[in-house]
Every structure is written in structure tokens, then in C-alpha cells.
């Protein structure tokens, strides 16, 4: 083997498998049982607001999903708010319905541990609305997931937002702001777009996804300063110092949500290591998301 050869990049799936195996070697304790979504007095569950289940067209999806749960166990994550995306986008109505059906099955398999986002493509307006209502009302999904099929300020998105408002569930919206176009994502929304959408629908519960996902996190945080209806998902693989503290200073702790987007150790370490007091960390790690989820009557 040539020692100068560049190693193959490690995929997130390989990392999750390795992390789960390493954690198992280091601790013989069994996975912790799931706690009720209503916390015991003085306790707040740790809720990952941004996670993904694996599409069933992938070999080994069962092992990948199990690895996600096992890593969450080892890192002290009590709840995973999960969506599943179609392998090809824009998603067809049949495609997103299939994904949501599999998410519902995972919710049943991991009773109370996996919370579902209903993924839809607003480009199929009636099918999207019907699917959101079916998922939330019949299967207990906790929110809506929108990806990059349409910029969030496109009028085709508005009926989806109105449905989420009516059902009193949040929308986790894929977002990013770079200083060059995102390849393959011409319709990606950014923090400014979500702020504009929030001005149109101030009652909407919007979540700007993965501020640490590789774009300009400082720009995104500043863009959301005057959009109190938008929460910030702190997930992503970028581990720059000071992101959490900067967001807490400009937006306030109550608007920040813990998330991993599959970068599990980075997501947990970012909050655990932040220069904030324990009360602020508890809000970010679960209290703020718990408050959002509590807005829909049970």
C-alpha cells in the first residue's frame, strides 16, 4: 500500500457505524429506555431537531437506522426528529408519500424515540397538503420538512405554510447562504428568505436548518435578527468556535435549537462546550423544541 495515497473519504453512514461500534466497546450498559415526551419535574429531554432516516432503496438501511439510535443512546439524545428524503429530487408525490410511510413505520418501531417530520414537495400542491394532514392527524407527525425544490418565498410554498399554521406544527426548512451558487441547488433558501416568509406569516413556526452546514453562519444569524418567528437549528458539520455564543447574543437563547443533521458528535459537543450557563444549554438542548411541540394540542 502506498503510504502517500489519499485515503477514501469516510461517509456519514460509515461514521455512524464506527461510532456505534466504538461506543459499544467502551460501555457495556444497554441503551437507555426512551422517556416520555413530557419530562419529569426538573428534567428536560434532549431533542435533536434535525435527523434523517435512510431511504429503503439503500442497502443496509436497517443497520444504518439502528446505528443512528445507538449513537444517540451513547451521546445522551432522547428524541430524534426525523425526516426521510427521496434519492432523486424534485420529489414526486408518490416518492414523498413512500418516504413518510417508512418514517411512520420507524416511529412505531422506536416507540416515542423517533418523531416524524412530513416531507413534501410543494410543487404538488394538493398532494402535499393532503399528505401533511394525513401524517399529522393520523400518524402523529410533529412537523413538516421542506427541502430545496422551491425557494421558501415562492408562492407555491404558501399553502404548505398555511397548513402547518392550521395544524400548529413547525416547518424545518433546508437552508444555506454561500458566497457562490450551491451546485445543484438553484432554489435553496437562506436566512433572509425565511425572514421574509416569517414577515408574511408571523404566526408560522419556522426553523432555519443547519446554520453550521457549510454556508456563512454569521450572515445567516444576522439575517434572522428581526424575524422572531424563525428558530435557528444549530446542526451541521462545521465546528467553528463561537457560533452558539454569537447566535445566543444576537437572537437570544430561546430561538436556538439543538440539532445534528447526522453530524452527531459535533452537534452535541457544540452545545455542551458552549460558553453558556446550564439553564441556557438546557433550553437549547431540548426545552425550546419541547415548547414548540407543545403548541399542538395532544
Briefly describe each language-model feature range.
Residues 2-49, 62, 66-79, 133, ...:
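Mid-to-C-terminal alpha-helical segments outside catalytic/metal-binding sites
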Residues 46-56, 172-176, 208:
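Histidine-centered catalytic micro-motifs
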Residues 50, 72, 103, 116, ...:
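Divalent metal-coordination and catalytic microenvironments
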Residues 52-63, 89-90, 181:
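Acidic/histidine-rich helix-loop elements
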Residues 52-54, 85-87, 119-123, 147-149, ...:
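Active-site beta-loop-alpha junctions enriched in small/polar residues
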Residues 63-68, 98-102, 130, 190-194, ...:
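Alpha-helical scaffolding within the catalytic cores
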Residues 139-143, 150, 154-257:
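Catalytic pocket-lining loop regions of alpha/beta-barrel enzymes
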Amino acid at each position: 500500500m502506498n503510504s502517500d495515497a489519499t485515503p477514501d473519504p469516510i461517509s456519514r453512514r460509515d461514521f455512524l457505524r464506527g461510532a456505534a461500534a466504538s461506543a459499544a466497546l467502551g460501555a457495556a450498559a444497554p441503551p437507555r429506555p426512551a422517556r416520555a415526551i413530557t419530562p419529569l419535574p426538573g428534567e428536560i429531554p434532549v431533542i435533536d431537531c434535525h435527523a434523517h432516516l435512510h431511504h429503503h432503496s439503500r442497502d443496509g438501511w436497517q443497520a444504518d437506522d439502528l446505528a443512528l439510535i445507538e449513537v444517540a443512546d451513547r451521546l445522551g439524545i432522547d428524541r430524534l426528529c426525523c425526516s426521510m428524503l427521496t434519492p432523486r429530487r424534485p420529489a414526486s408525490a408518490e416518492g414523498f408519500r413512500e418516504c413518510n410511510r417508512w418514517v411512520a413505520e420507524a416511529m412505531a418501531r422506536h416507540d416515542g424515540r423517533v418523531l416524524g417530520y412530513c416531507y413534501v414537495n410543494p410543487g404538488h400542491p394538493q398532494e402535499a397538503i393532503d399528505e401533511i394532514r394525513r401524517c399529522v392527524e393520523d400518524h402523529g407527525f410533529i412537523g413538516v420538512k421542506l427541502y430545496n425544490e422551491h425557494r421558501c418565498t415562492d408562492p407555491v410554498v404558501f399553502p404548505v405554510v398555511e397548513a402547518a399554521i392550521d395544524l400548529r406544527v413547525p416547518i424545518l426548512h433546508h437552508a444555506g447562504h454561500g458566497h457562490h451558487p450551491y451546485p445543484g441547488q438553484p432554489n435553496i433558501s437562506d436566512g433572509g428568505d425565511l425572514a421574509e416568509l416569517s414577515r408574511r406569516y408571523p404566526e408560522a413556526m419556522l426553523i432555519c436548518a443547519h446554520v453550521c452546514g457549510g454556508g456563512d453562519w454569521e450572515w445567516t444569524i444576522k439575517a434572522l435578527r428581526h424575524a422572531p418567528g424563525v428558530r435557528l437549528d444549530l446542526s451541521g458539520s462545521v465546528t467553528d468556535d463561537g457560533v452558539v455564543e454569537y447566535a445566543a447574543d444576537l437572537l437570544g437563547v430561546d430561538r436556538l435549537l439543538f440539532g445534528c443533521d447526522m453530524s452527531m458528535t459535533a452537534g452535541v459537543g457544540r452545545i455542551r462546550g458552549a460558553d453558556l450557563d446550564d439553564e441556557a444549554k438546557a433550553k437549547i438542548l431540548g426545552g425550546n423544541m419541547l415548547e414548540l411541540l407543545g403548541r399542538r394540542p395532544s
